[in-house]
């Protein structure tokens, strides 16, 4: 039905007759000539109909937005004065010779103009229309190019594309599982996989030493701009490769993607330890485009007569750190109060500040509500430590170390945006040497990555003796403050795996019930293995500049995990529930506060 895509027509086709199909993006009658913008997934081309062909002209005059049509015409060059540099096809136009309406369109429920706002609900309800918009179509086409490039790279490096089960067993991986009731085994449930983690390890044990899969994963968790209940991973696992080798190979893949698809040379990725990232940036996924860093000043303020500072400064678990913001002294008191309110979201109790209005005036040039607690020597030491100049602003975080890191790390990002401090377009890095475990709110231990991550150079006995001091052989790839992917060397010894389970409070009986198949498999010559999983949706979001992963997925869910297009989730009918042995129990209404007094 067509000879070319609309967006592919160019000057090399001048003088040729082409057949195109697509949708009417816009139609207008200017001085007795009909100009038609015809759109398909590759772009838009202008078609011109004039009255010299009255039958075709009359049909063209009836066209409206989103009519699906076929046109035949002659490619001709536009006059220089009419060239549109904003269009790929802007040097040419089609003189329409024939026109067939393949289907008309009802009045549109959403606005197709990119400059007009549609609600998220409208866009998802009429996603098939939303996806016709060029910016959305471009992202979906770009996504296909990324997955194609990934497959070419991995296939070319000896990786095998192997599918793993979607109906599997629930395992504790951090988020809630989506459960699927079994009709055959009443009262029992499959779980949709949060990742193929255990199956890809089993593939290593099976001798398939290089595996990959572009795979759907499912997590029933609260959603954010970069989270969806179902998402796609580029899942990779290897045997007989060290963590350094896995990092080198996957870095090569990502650098190749950016070079091929964006013509961007990312260069060699620097490496940074988890401890350094948290100390300098308050985050284990630092955005290195932002020049601001957290600067420790506990040693300077530990003797001041101000409990907000000297308390954390003298607490082994406390921290006092500052941000020095160039030009920040211009902020009003109201704006500073907004910053103080912002850090409370992250657990901070408040935010002290110091304006350097005029460095030459000494203490007279310093403005701060806590200045009365600070001697001139302390102020001078702070100025020297931070390198603050006239017009700068110093912001203080003082609390438990984890709260200071989280609150000041978040404030660092906000200030970087507010003051337009971001430098460069792409800043990748590897974050390595993560703690194996972290404390939970109830004092227990939680695996920072997952319970199958191997420690660096420790025996099971050493690990159980000092779990909180253990460093994992794990690595995260970070770009512009987003985690692109994370991985680790895996445990390949049953004794070490059992030790990790015990540290996490999983006794031998529970471990046998939930992971017995893994512990058994580890007994039969399991090779050393390591891997990594990338969030494909997040990679596409960054590469296309989209604001949400919903804008790079064909049919995403809302932030409440619903699909307005199909009205999913929906109720099952009683017959289906009976076959599954499932009954629906109405949730009990929450007790009124007065009823509990």
Curated annotation (Swiss-Prot):
Pfam families the record matches: GAD (PF02938), tRNA-synt_2 (PF00152), tRNA_anti-codon (PF01336)
Annotated GO CC locations: cytoplasm
GO BP terms, alphabetized: aspartyl-tRNA aminoacylation
CDD domains: AspRS_core, EcAspRS_like_N
Keyword Aminoacyl-tRNA synthetase included in the entry's annotation: yes
Keywords recorded for this protein, A-Z: Aminoacyl-tRNA synthetase, ATP-binding, Cytoplasm, Ligase, Nucleotide-binding, Protein biosynthesis
Main location: cytoplasm
Top-level enzyme category: ligase
Reaction catalyzed: tRNA(Asp) + L-aspartate + ATP = L-aspartyl-tRNA(Asp) + AMP + diphosphate
Source domain of life: Bacteria
GO MF annotation list: aspartate-tRNA ligase activity; ATP binding; nucleic acid binding
Residues that, per the record, bind L-aspartate: 173, 219, 449, 490
Region Aspartate, residue ranges: 197-200
UniProt family annotation: Belongs to the class-II aminoacyl-tRNA synthetase family. Type 1 subfamily.
Role description: Catalyzes the attachment of L-aspartate to tRNA(Asp) in a two-step reaction: L-aspartate is first activated by ATP to form Asp-AMP and then transferred to the acceptor end of tRNA(Asp).
HAMAP family listed in its UniProt record: Asp_tRNA_synth_type1
Protein name (database record): Aspartate--tRNA ligase
């Amino acid at each position: 039905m067509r000879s070319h895509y609309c967006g592919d027509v160019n000057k090399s086709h001048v003088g040729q007759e082409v057949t195109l199909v697509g949708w009417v993006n816009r139609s207008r009658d200017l001085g007795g000539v009909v100009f038609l913008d015809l759109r398909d997934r590759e772009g838009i081309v202008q078609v011109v109909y004039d009255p010299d062909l009255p039958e075709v002209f009359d049909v063209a005059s009836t066209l409206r937005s989103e009519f699906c049509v076929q046109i035949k015409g002659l490619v001709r060059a536009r006059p220089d004065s009419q060239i549109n540099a904003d269009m790929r096809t802007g040097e040419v136009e089609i003189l329409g010779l024939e026109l067939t309406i393949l289907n008309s369109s009802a009045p549109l429920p959403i606005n197709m103009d990119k400059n007009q706002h549609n609600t998220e609900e409208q866009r998802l309800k009429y996603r098939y229309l939303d996806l016709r918009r060029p910016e959305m179509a471009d992202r979906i086409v770009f996504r296909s190019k990324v997955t194609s490039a990934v497959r070419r790279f991995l296939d070319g490096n000896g990786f095998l594309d192997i599918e793993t089960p979607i109906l599997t067993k629930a395992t504790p991986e951090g988020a809630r599982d989506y459960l699927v009731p079994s009709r055959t085994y009443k009262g029992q449930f499959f779980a949709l996989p949060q990742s193929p983690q255990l199956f890809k390890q089993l593939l290593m044990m099976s001798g398939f030493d290089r595996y990959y899969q572009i795979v759907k994963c499912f997590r029933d968790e609260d959603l954010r701009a970069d989270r969806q209940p179902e998402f796609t991973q580029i899942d990779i696992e290897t045997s007989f490769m060290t963590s350094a080798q896995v990092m080198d190979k996957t870095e090569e893949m990502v650098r190749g993607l950016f070079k091929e698809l964006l013509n961007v040379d990312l260069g060699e990725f620097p490496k940074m330890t988890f401890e350094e990232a948290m100390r300098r940036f308050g985050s284990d996924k630092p955005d290195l485009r932002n020049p601001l860093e957290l600067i420790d000043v506990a040693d300077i303020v530990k003797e001041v007569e101000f409990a907000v500072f000297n308390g954390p400064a003298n607490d082994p678990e406390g921290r006092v750190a500052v941000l020095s913001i160039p030009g920040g002294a211009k902020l009003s008191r109201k704006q500073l109060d907004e910053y103080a309110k912002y850090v409370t979201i992250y657990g901070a109790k408040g935010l002290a500040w110091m304006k350097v209005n005029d460095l030459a005036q000494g203490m007279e040039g310093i403005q701060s509500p806590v200045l009365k607690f600070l001697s001139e020597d302390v102020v001078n030491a702070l100025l020297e430590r931070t390198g603050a100049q006239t017009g700068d602003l110093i912001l203080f975080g003082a609390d438990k170390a984890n709260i200071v890191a989280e609150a000041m790390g978040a404030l660092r990002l906000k200030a970087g945006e507010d003051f337009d401090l971001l430098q460069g377009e792409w800043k990748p890095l590897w974050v390595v040497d993560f703690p194996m475990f972290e404390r939970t709110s109830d004092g227990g231990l939680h695996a920072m990555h997952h319970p199958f991550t191997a420690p660096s150079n420790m025996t099971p006995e050493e690990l159980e003796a000092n779990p909180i001091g253990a460093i994992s052989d794990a690595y995260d790839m970070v770009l512009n403050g987003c985690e692109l992917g994370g991985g680790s060397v895996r445990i390949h010894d049953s004794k070490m795996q059992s030790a990790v389970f015990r540290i996490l409070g999983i006794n031998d009986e529970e471990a046998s019930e939930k992971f017995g198949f893994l512990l058994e498999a580890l007994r039969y010559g399991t090779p050393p293995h390591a891997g990594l999983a990338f969030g494909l949706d997040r990679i596409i979001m960054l590469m296309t500049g989209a604001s949400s992963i919903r804008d790079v997925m064909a049919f995403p869910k809302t932030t409440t995990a619903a699909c307005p297009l199909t009205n999913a989730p929906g109720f099952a009918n009683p017959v289906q529930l009976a076959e599954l042995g499932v009954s629906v129990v109405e949730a009990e209404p929450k007790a009124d506060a007065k009823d509990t007094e």
